[in-house]
UniProtKB/Swiss-Prot annotation:
It is an enzyme of class 7 (translocase). This is Methionine import ATP-binding protein MetN 1. Its main location: membrane. It is found in: Cell inner membrane. PANTHER family: AMINO ACID IMPORT ATP-BINDING PROTEIN, METHIONINE IMPORT ATP-BINDING PROTEIN METN. The complex is composed of two ATP-binding proteins (MetN), two transmembrane proteins (MetI) and a solute-binding protein (MetQ). Gene3D superfamilies: 3.30.70.260, P-loop containing nucleotide triphosphate hydrolases. Residues 2-242 form the ABC transporter domain. GO terms for cellular component: plasma membrane. Part of the ABC transporter complex MetNIQ involved in methionine import. Responsible for energy coupling to the transport system.
Amino acid sequence: MIEFQNVHKTYRVAGKDITALHPTSFSIENGQVFGLIGHSGAGKSTLLRLINRLEQSSGGKIIVDGEEVTALDANGLRRFRQQVGMIFQHFNLLASKTVADNVALPLTLAGELSRAEIDQRVAELLARVGLSDHAKKYPAQLSGGQKQRVGIARALATKPKILLCDEATSALDPQTTASVLQLLAEINRELKLTIVLITHEMDVIRRVCDQVGVMDAGVIVEQGSVADVFLHPKHPTTKRFVQESEQIDESEQRDDFAHVPGRIVRLTFQGEATYAPLLGTVARETGVDYSILAGRIDRIKDIPYGQLTLAVTGGDMDAAFARFTAADVHMEVLR
């Protein structure tokens, strides 16, 4: 488990204190994929780099599997960092070294394996990320997605328990992003790695994360399971991210629906309820009529969900709304 206990970070810039992270406490369970989302300057990169002490905290404690990382001396920190892999937005590969040599670098620096053992480990890692045929190529000969796969293989070289991902997909096109996220999900599932990733894209969180923390101005303003936070956002920052990811403009929707009669509600379904014939059943039981104004079905990681915006008229509306609630469907009255 990764635990933050009242951790904060302040920089001294031009004689002034700039707070990048306000006192923060939260925990990440082992084997979890935890996402931090926020706009530029929200403090997410600072928080991520505090975990392996690329940044030094100004106060508080960071505890990993019972060990206080913030109290480690140089030798202890060196040992701890072998348990933490990291991948970066711009790959950080050495241009003069081959793919295999880039992956071997942390093993060579550790000095604990023979050359034959390193070669075997590198071959295993390149096979895992699908680059066995590219071992002798140089970074300049690779696509962006292939470079990031090399970065992932290198990060896994020392068999870490934790993988930190610093905007790992923001420099990639959508198709390549999807393939890299699928690889990270496979690594999490097969190796039981704890993954902490930061991003400014809600779609990245939705595809691979179990839990999410939303950051704004150095504060985690909302935290919870991805399904709860994504489908039922509470903080204005979270709501903006959701609206941006779904390309929703609420003011435009209000204008579009202004002429529509009846009550307007938004229903959110999760799991098997997404496919249940609930609307028809409720309409027959309560006599209401409905018009579908907007809708979508998608997945949050492996969980199907659906959202419908309805105009409801006639019949017993109160009974219909109670029926929706009883069916474990989240209902929001928009008008």
